[in-house]
Amino acid sequence: MTISDKIRIYELSRDLNLENKDILDAAQKLSISVKSHSSSISAEEAKKIKNLINKKNSDKKILSINKPSIKKDNFKQNKSPSISSKKETPLKDNSNKKPLLIKPLNKPESVKIISNQLQNSNKPNIVNTSQSRANLTNTNINSKTSQNLNQDKKTFENNITPPIKSPAKPPIQLIAKPKNINNNVKSNESSQNISSAGDNRRLSNKPDQNTNKPKTKNYDSKIKTPELVGAPIRREDPKINPNKQNNKQNIAFKQTGSNRIGSPNRPGMPNNRPGLRNKPSDQGRPGSFNRQGNPNRPGMPNNRPGLRNKPSDQGRHGSFNRQGNPNRPGMPNNRPGSKFNGQNSSGIRKPVSPNELLQLQKNNNSEKDNKDKNNNAKQNINGPNQKAKAPNMRPNATPSSKKPPHRAFSNSSKKPGKTDWDDSAKLEALRSKNPQKQRQKVHIIGENDDSLTSETSGYSGEKISILSASLARPKKEKSEETKSQKSIKQFKKKKKETTRQRQKRRAMELKAAKEAKQVRPEMIIVPEDNLTVQELADKLSLESSEIIKSLFFKGITATVTQSLDLATIETVAEEFGVPVLQDDIQEAAEKTVDMIESDDIDNLIRRPPVITVMGHVDHGKTSLLDSIRESRVASGEAGGITQHIGAYQVEFEHESQKKKLTFLDTPGHEAFTAMRARGTKVTDVAVLVVAADDGCRPQTLEAISHARAAKVPIVVAINKIDKEGASPDRVKQELSEKDLIAEDWGGDTVMVPVSAIKKQNIDKLLEMILLVSEVEDLQANPDRFAKGTVIEAHLDKAKGPVATLLVQNGTLKSGDVLAAGSVLGKIRAMVDEHGNRIKEAGPSFPVEALGFSEVPTAGDEFEVYPDEKAGRAIVGERATDARATKLAQQMASRRVSLSSLSTQANDGELKELNLILKADVQGSVEAILGSLEQLPKNEVQVRVLFSAPGEITETDIDLAAASGSVIIGFNTSLASGAKRAADANDVDIREYEVIYKLLEDIQLAMEGLLEPDLVEESLGQAEVRATFSVGKGAIAGCYIQTGKLQRNCSLRVIRSEKVIFEGNLDSLKRAKDDVKEVNTGFECGVGCDKFSSWIEGDVIEAFKFVTKKRTLSQ
């Protein structure tokens, strides 16, 4: 098909005079793929769309025929006869018919009125299409109606109850009671409406006899399935009583149950409207629609107590039941201009339609309820003196001047035939094709409708009691339903709140019980040096509110999701008694690389065990190792503490055989955590040294966690048993709380009490170490390239980069090319712990190696490669990763948070202390950097611009001079020319040998950058005992009670315990002489330039401001 055969959507909409969305909707229903109004479709598809739209237009034409046939012009014409009939009716007839108020059923005139009405109503004057449609059934219905009317007259006269037959003396008390009066008025109305109601019901139950239209069956089939619910209607039993007399008697009572008049017969409309109920134009045609809430079911009487049938809407041609205003059976449509209204006006003034009563019309179509209501109605028909129930009483209401268009019309100036009815009819017709369940609409009648006056109710000139609208509405049903709904809502709401509160209480109880049962963890691990408040609370088994409260008291405002740095985490954890371990340190303690490979299995031999000595500082680790080595290493260490990892190999004779043991001595100071972790990473057996007089300390617990992370056995050496106050059992008790139970207590942990100074039980300790190592079955393959770990590394000014290596597998030889991390090296020389040069080193042998291109990182694994090319390729990849990691660390260190920015904005520019750090070995650099991170940084920030192992060079001096930094040297020396360059550039160089002193000086330097605080210092107190006027001012004669007064000091005047003045003391005299100060017990004169209102009894407090040095803790 060519493009010329294509048609666009907007062209088709223009041809059909429709909107684009209508065409798109039609295309969607026909499953034609279109996207927008500019989409193209084929001519065949366009034809399908046109057919569908033409079909819809044909349905709309049917709806336009079914509109209300009475137009405004016709309505005006129909209105005049009712007015004329009203005027022509003589008022004197009311006096003759006044007894009808009490017993209207006994008067035959009521039947005559009905017959006259029916005769007069046989003069139709229907306009437009309603006439042609009414003629279809009028011929059949009129004959049937006349027969039924004659039968109704006879039946009505024969079935009048005897108590109603006394017309002479109407009881006066019934006039005063609104219920009986209304009941009588209803009975009078029933005499006028009985024939139309009865015939209407009978004809509606026999649609096939009255019309030959096949659409009536369609209506019956549609109505016989009452799926929908509607307004509460008091109906009779759905089975019509074959005894028509009793049936009519019931109908008469039900119609007299409220002050309603029958359906008005408008002039020009046929009176036999009951026959028009089954017309296909209204009930059977596709365009008609009965509201979902109230279907007219055949066989079900539409006469509820107190409500008349409404034949006007059922029989009117072209009428339809709008959803907002359904045709409810028994609801009259009192339209102005009705001929019947003219008849009624001759005897009784027309009461207003009960549609306007204030009530909620709700659904009640159960047959059981209808039977109960009908039985109540039959009991009420026994006589007019019997009281009727309140729900059946319908008072006359004043018609409101303005009513919603969906209500029934009363005798007011409101005209029917609103245009919005036509639109709703089209909507309902479309919905009737695809019926679906619709939400029931409840409409509330206007509040003005329940105002009752004597002008609209009862006989003319007669006083009548007014019934309140609250009594007229169906109390029982409405109140019970509303009350039940409210009670259910209240119950549900109360239940929901109670459940929430109960769940909250249970959760709190569970948490309290959990906290009571939980024990604080031995140690927490901090991943990546930060944790959120919630994560820290979970690790500490605490509520997050406890962490936030602890931080608040420290001056830190935090939320649950805020991240905390390592220093803050350690501070909070220490408050709750839990030590902190960094995650990278934990990972450093784990053995990540398996030194034994599958190719080594055939050549494995036993190797010496590697033993790491660990414990708290000053617990005697190095002294114990000295006793084993029979040397004096500890005495030669700075400050008497170990600040390096020492690697030693010892020969020990066991069972007539010489055994080699390799010992690693780790620092016990808290700053050397990373060193301890590296020690456990390469160890085979961990020796935990605990002082018998000190017990378990934080570093002891940390060492235990390292050993467990490395999954190595632990041998406990309880040292210093020779000291006073030593208690080995107390140490065992504390260790048992950490799941280290001694063998003599039934556990599996070897514990040996020793004395390093007196060398007690040293041999026993070595035997236990060998026994444990034999159980581990330690093996290695010496016939391969060496693999191992860098224990320590430093830069020697004479030798260059030097690394302490521990060979774990294979044999390391001079001249081997090795890669340690991202550093490539070729072994030039190897030295053992005694300083002797060796050619090769086997498994478990520690050596110092020279020949690296730069200082390797302590803790890295090294491996020997066959040639330099292979090693360089590996090093290049590792160097790239190392640079990325270093850059990420630098970016993290420069990270600025909003809190730090706000601090700088409030307190001015943040002060910084720039440092350049040089140390002897890499481990010392790590320890110092870790300690600096833990210093308070609220007001002073420490920035380490450069840190490396090695001596201080001129390059370091130049960098310090350019950045204003201080150079920190730790166990290192100055290169040649560095001292002269430092003096020339005025660079401060500080050298330290002990880490304690280094950290103290840095903290003092940070405090020196803080501005001092001004603190008030009290000088003395004096009392005013006399006042003297001098010129414009006044002098206070004072007596010094305590301290002294100084000239130009600050003072405050206190009167009646309130400060009334604060300023400077400008004049101080003793007798007539000016003095600088006056001490306690003397009198003096005090004068202030800005204060002269002295009164005897005033107290003068003298003080001055002094500066106080601030500390970082503040």
From Swiss-Prot:
InterPro entries on file: EF-G-like_DII, IF2_II, IF2_N, P-loop_NTPase, Small_GTP-bd, T_Tr_GTP-bd_dom, TF_IF2_bacterial-like, TIF_IF2
Binding site for GTP: 615-622, 665-669, 719-722
Compositionally biased spans, kind Basic and acidic residues: 85-96, 365-375, 417-431
Molecular function in Gene Ontology: GTP binding; GTPase activity; translation initiation factor activity
Superkingdom of origin organism: Bacteria
GO CC aspect terms: cytosol
Keywords: Cytoplasm, GTP-binding, Initiation factor, Nucleotide-binding, Protein biosynthesis
Ranges for region Disordered: 69-102, 181-507
Stretch list, region G5: 755-757
Region G3, annotated ranges: 665-668
Residues in tr-type G domain copies: 606-778
Principal subcellular localisation of the protein: cytoplasm
Signal sequence interval, chain numbering: none
Span list, region G1: 615-622
UniProt region (G2), positions on chain: 640-644
Cellular location(s): Cytoplasm
Compositional bias of kind Polar residues: 181-198, 252-261
Biased amino acid composition, Low complexity: 240-251, 262-278, 290-309, 321-337, 376-385
A Pfam family of this chain: EF-G_D2
UniProt region (G4), positions on chain: 719-722
Residue ranges with Basic residues bias: 489-505
Function: One of the essential components for the initiation of protein synthesis. Protects formylmethionyl-tRNA from spontaneous hydrolysis and promotes its binding to the 30S ribosomal subunits. Also involved in the hydrolysis of GTP during the formation of the 70S ribosomal complex.
Family under the similarity heading: Belongs to the TRAFAC class translation factor GTPase superfamily. Classic translation factor GTPase family. IF-2 subfamily.
Name of the protein in question: Translation initiation factor IF-2
Originating organism: Prochlorococcus marinus (strain MIT 9301)
The gene coding this protein: infB
